[in-house]
UniProtKB/Swiss-Prot annotation:
Native organism: Escherichia coli (strain K12)
GO terms for biological process, alphabetical: DNA damage response
Name of the protein in its database record: UPF0304 protein YfbU
Alphabetical list of Pfam families matching this protein: YfbU
Domain of life from the UniProt record: Bacteria
Length: 164
């Protein structure tokens, strides 16, 4: 991230104010303030990640993934023989914090800030699947979109989706 000295000074002052306004996160803000003031290039890349963007198409895909899991769980709940499919298989895991942090951040934003999909269980890891999931979800979406009744899936259709 390239910043002029004036921009760095302004951002440093913002972090200083945030330290006072949000004591619970003061240590984090002091760290970021030091990085900005001293211009540590490697650590400044963290700011690129924090100020990155997700394209509208990506956001819509993530919502579609979450909606698919909602449909999977509703359909599973309506099955007469739920024992044939483990409930954990139709539970949304989230994304990998190490390699899919922006996707994970968007999921957390949708659930915790926007109040959508609040019935999803964040588990002890807060939707951190701890393994890359994007490609798996893409395969699952392809199968789900081909189903004629996406919210009234049969056991066979559920299995096809989760095994994609």
């Amino acid at each position: 991230m390239e910043m002029t000295n004036a921009q760095r000074l302004i951002l440093s002052n913002q972090y200083k104010m945030m330290t006072m306004l949000d004591p619970a996160n003061a240590e984090r803000y002091r760290r970021l303030q030091t990085i900005i003031e001293r211009g540590y290039g490697l650590q400044m890349r963290e700011l690129d990640r924090e100020f990155g963007e997700l394209k509208e198409e990506t956001c819509r895909t993530i919502i579609d993934i979450m909606e698919m899991y909602h449909a999977l769980h509703v359909s599973w709940s309506n099955l007469q023989d739920q024992q044939s499919i483990d409930e954990r298989r139709v539970t949304f895991l989230g994304f990998d914090a190490a390699t899919e942090a922006r996707y994970l951040g968007y999921v957390r934003f949708m659930v915790n800030v926007e109040g959508r999909y609040t019935h999803f269980d964040a588990g002890t890891h807060g939707f951190n699947a701890q393994t890359p999931m994007w490609e798996k979800y893409q395969r699952m979406l392809n199968v789900w979109h081909a189903c004629p009744r996406q919210y009234h899936l049969s056991a066979n259709e559920i299995n096809q989706i989760i095994n994609a």
